[in-house]
Swiss-Prot record:
Active site: E316
Name of the featured protein: Nicotinate-nucleotide--dimethylbenzimidazole phosphoribosyltransferase
Pathway(s) annotated for this protein in UniProt: Nucleoside biosynthesis; alpha-ribazole biosynthesis; alpha-ribazole from 5,6-dimethylbenzimidazole: step 1/2
Domain of life: Bacteria
Family, similarity comment: Belongs to the CobT family.
Pfam families linked to this entry: DBI_PRT
Glycosyltransferase is among the record's keywords: yes
Membrane-crossing residue ranges in chain numbering: none
Biological-process GO terms, alphabetical: cobalamin biosynthetic process
UniProt organism field: Pseudomonas syringae pv. tomato (strain ATCC BAA-871 / DC3000)
Length: 350
């Protein structure tokens, strides 16, 4: 791993611009702090974008898809062929994220990193690393070479996004079994017990959750030597799409593009990214707090302040996309409101 590009520092925050944005917020015609998180969001974006007038109009949504060998252990409520079927749905416009992308005027980048059955689908970028990952209860989910290729795939999507002037990047995922993989990665990175982070995923009942937990515990025992190591945990227990998301978040920070993180699986990728390169944390916004029980713990670990709490558990980047209108409105409020002086409104006495 001589070319460890992910260790390159993130772009620096423009502190003077952030301070100028904070000063502007204090002059707008409202009680100081009354717009709460929206104010903080606008100030944060000003510092990250280095702009007096922050914006989130140019939106890129990348959906990374891959299958998981651990599905053979019965950890998902859905059959594996759904992953490939959903690729059709994404590009045909019928998926939730497809609808949201249209409504938000976003560029949708759908990437097949390794579904079980190869497909020649127009509108899908085929960067196949393998026919799904290996079953991580028998050995590593990925080889090092496959893991590095998946990281690079995420980075490549960000570079494509940067080339068209993207202001906000969303990563989404599709892969039956990927909540099991994400839970296993997070448990390994955080060195915590599986029941803390294992949940129903796409709809397991209580018995299914118990079984899924036991499968993950077997995998954690097998790969115990890598506990606490973010990269090895990712490669041994993760999926192609989780690794691609990790690479995307790292690249966003390095290229100066703000990323909006989606739900549980994306937050696990964000956790790995931050553990690999702590400087990338400033460039991550968090769209929502999802229904998966472990998501709350991850958000607390990442000291994240999600914008929405709607009980979502879909994935695909959908929760992050739903938060985009709030980001855009935060920018519009910051940019468009009058100051007390401009509106000839009396400010609160000092």
């Amino acid at each position: 791993m001589s070319n460890s590009w992910w260790l390159k520092p993130a772009q620096a925050i423009d502190v003077p611009m952030r301070e100028a944005a904070l000063a502007r917020q204090q002059q707008l015609t409202k009680p100081a702090g009354s717009l709460a998180q929206l104010e903080r969001l606008a100030v944060q974006l000003s510092g990250l974008q280095g702009r007096e007038r922050p914006a989130a109009d140019k939106l890129w949504i990348a959906i990374f898809a891959g299958d998981h060998g651990v599905v053979a252990e019965g950890v998902s409520a859905y059959p594996q062929e759904v992953t490939g079927q959903m690729l059709h749905n994404f590009v045909n416009g019928g998926a939730a994220i497809s609808v949201l992308a249209r409504q938000l005027s976003a560029q949708l980048d759908v990437v097949d990193l390794g579904t079980v059955s190869p497909m020649d689908l127009p509108g899908v970028r085929h960067l196949r690393i393998g026919a799904g990952t290996a079953n991580f209860v028998d050995g590593p989910a990925m080889t090092v070479e496959q893991g590095l290729a998946a990281l690079q795939a995420g980075r490549d999507s960000v570079l494509r996004a940067k080339a068209v002037g993207t202001e906000l990047f969303i990563g989404g995922e599709m892969g039956i079994g990927n909540t099991a993989a994400a839970s296993a990665v997070a448990c390994s990175v955080l060195e915590c017990a599986a029941p803390l982070l294992v949940g129903p995923g796409t709809g397991l009942n209580a018995e299914g959750i118990v079984h899924k937990t036991r499968v993950i515990e077997r995998a954690l025992a097998l790969h115990a030597e890598h506990a606490g190591d973010p990269l090895q945990s990712l490669f041994c227990l993760g999926g192609f799409e989780i690794a691609a998301l990790t690479g995307a978040y790292l690249a966003c920070a390095q290229e100066g593009i703000v990323a909006m993180v989606d739900g549980f699986i994306c937050s696990v990728a964000a956790l790995v990214a931050v553990r690999l390169n702590p400087s990338c944390r400033d460039w991550l916004l968090f769209g929502h707090r999802g229904a998966e029980p472990g998501h709350r713990h991850l958000l607390e670990t990442l000291q994240a302040e999600p914008l929405l709490d709607l009980g979502l558990r879909l994935g695909e980047g959908s929760g992050a996309a739903l938060a985009v209108p709030l980001v855009r409105l935060a920018c519009e409020l910051h940019n468009g409101m009058a100051t007390f002086a401009e509106a000839a409104v009396a400010d609160r006495p000092a």
